[in-house]
Amino acid sequence: RKRDRIETIDKQAGTKVLLSFGRPSSGATLLHLTNQLLRRGGTHPNVTALHITTDKDINPIEADKFYQDSFRPILRAAEELEQPLETDYIVADEVESAVLNKLTSERYNLLIVGAGVRLSSDEDDREASSMRQQMSRFMGSLPMRTTESLLSIHSMLRDKMAFFVHRAPCSVGILLSRSFDSPKHILVYVRSASDLRLLPYARTMAENNQATLRIVLSTGVARESLNSHPGEEIITTDKLCSVPAECDLVVVSYTYWQESFDTCEELLAQLPSTLILNLK
């Protein structure tokens, strides 16, 4: 079983990843996630960082400055992680379509994006910030996590997930970041047999961060199918219960996210950083 797992992770470590980011700081966060998710020892994933702007009126000097400003944090993170990184800067009318074209033409295995604000334009970032401020004035008694959930998830995350999940020719990972760093307590939901494919990723995250791993297993999935590893905690339940306070990363399939989390605002407000995976 250990050998099978190593072979699986070795394949992941050679994965060709497109990391698409908008805000400069989010690029560094997504690179840390990708490295933790796919690195196996000294074997790193093959990552291309993509930033897209929709402003076609910028001149070459401005474009060079935008490039430097946009990629500085992720290049710094790549150096710290010793993670090889290619970069690509594109000017396009539609961000999502440009990402899809690159995925299709260059045959990537995995797309990684963030869920906090829309993919690329600074204007969208400013609109999101303005919405948060307006929401805070009307809902000042609510914690920021609740406000972030209502805004970031419902107004932006659904459309982004649906577009890429249904149109991308590869697997998709979407990070809902709550100050994502190096998680120490990871929770993964295995609600069906197909969700067993999440385990190698969750286990690699746990191993690379020296973290604990808790598996929430549906009663419809045979416990023996987990090939459980020492130190893992397994909880068998069909109830969608509160996320433990100490948990700092949730891993969940896109299907289960749609069925459960996306319809429960109270649970959304509790979520720590969450990785939503649609594996193909």
Q: Where do the protein language model's features map onto the residues?
A:
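Aromatic/hydrophobic pocket-lining residues that form π-stacking "cages" and hydrophobic walls in ligand
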Residues: 34, 74, 99, 161, ...
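Soluble catalytic regions of membrane-associated enzymes that act on cell-envelope
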Residues: 47-53, 60-96, 103-106, 110, ...
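Conserved helix-loop functional segments at active or binding sites
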Residues: 36, 76, 80, 105, ...
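Short phosphate-binding loop-to-helix
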Residues: 91-100, 237-243
